[in-house]
Amino acid sequence: MIQQESRLRVADNTGAKEILCIRVLGGSSRRYAGIGDVIVATVKDAIPGGNVKRGDVVKAVVVRTVKERRRPDGSYIKFDENAAVLIKADNDPRGTRIFGPVGRELRDKKFMKIVSLAPEVL
């Protein structure tokens, strides 16, 4: 469950290491984002020479959350950290690699490129 001011780890190789959520997209009064939801964020920590630098405003899709999520079959999925992948305007990932597992909900929300790059889909 990601809300404004939440900090997330970046799970790709764009050069950003940590982002801070500015806004959850999908309605004027939407408060929380889960796996597969798009957020607007700012880069809080980045490595030198990366594609993005500190202070950049970016769009990202949430791929892992600590808050458990109930699936239609009754099972629950949760992760050890909150993580996101930076995306372009056309919802393709900005990086060329994805680190760590991602939730199956990304496939339902049509983020197929991220699913194909991920080493594991849970």
Curated annotation (Swiss-Prot):
InterPro entries for the chain: Ribosomal_uL14 (IPR000218), Ribosomal_uL14_bac-type (IPR005745), Ribosomal_uL14_CS (IPR019972), Ribosomal_uL14_sf (IPR036853)
Record's keyword terms, sorted: Ribonucleoprotein, Ribosomal protein, RNA-binding, rRNA-binding
A GO term, aspect molecular function: structural constituent of ribosome
Gene Ontology CC terms, in alphabetical order: cytosolic large ribosomal subunit
Annotated signal peptide: none
GO biological process: translation
Pfam families: Ribosomal_L14
Role: Binds to 23S rRNA. Forms part of two intersubunit bridges in the 70S ribosome.
PANTHER family membership: 50S/60S RIBOSOMAL PROTEIN L14/L23 (PTHR11761), LARGE RIBOSOMAL SUBUNIT PROTEIN UL14M (PTHR11761:SF3)
HAMAP family in alphabetical order: Ribosomal_uL14 (MF_01367)
Assembly information from the UniProt record: Part of the 50S ribosomal subunit. Forms a cluster with proteins L3 and L19. In the 70S ribosome, L14 and L19 interact and together make contacts with the 16S rRNA in bridges B5 and B8.
Name of this protein: Large ribosomal subunit protein uL14
Organism: Nocardia farcinica (strain IFM 10152)
Upper lineage: Bacteria, Bacillati, Actinomycetota, Actinomycetes, Mycobacteriales
